[in-house]
Amino acid sequence: MERCIAQARKYYAMKGELPFKEDYLKQDAIALNVQRACELCIDIANHLIKTKKLGLPQDSKDSFSLLQRGGLINEAMMASLRAMVGFRNILVHQYQKLDLDIMGDIIEHRLDALLDFANTALAASD
């Protein structure tokens, strides 16, 4: 997960010949790494749910709700992770055109939530 996040940040910061909004290769590289990091969080969440016997999530977003109800993450972390799953769903299923301003905001301000979750999950699994 750390590598995926580092790669996404690296690609975002790279200066290229094209502006970010026109550099589809850079956008795809970032999207793939963010998607992978989100999917790792979902996998970790589902593993914790199973080992702690917290129930059966109805979907990926619900995994984080179950962890919050089980006392393993706080409400702010749950909300942040559910939002990241929503962004991941847009990346994977292309529900709508990718909003590059949102992608930029995620790279600049929201990826640490995934790392925070990984650390929280690691502590909870002890």
Predicted stretch roles:
Residues 1-126:
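Solvent-exposed interaction patches of small proteins and small membrane subunits
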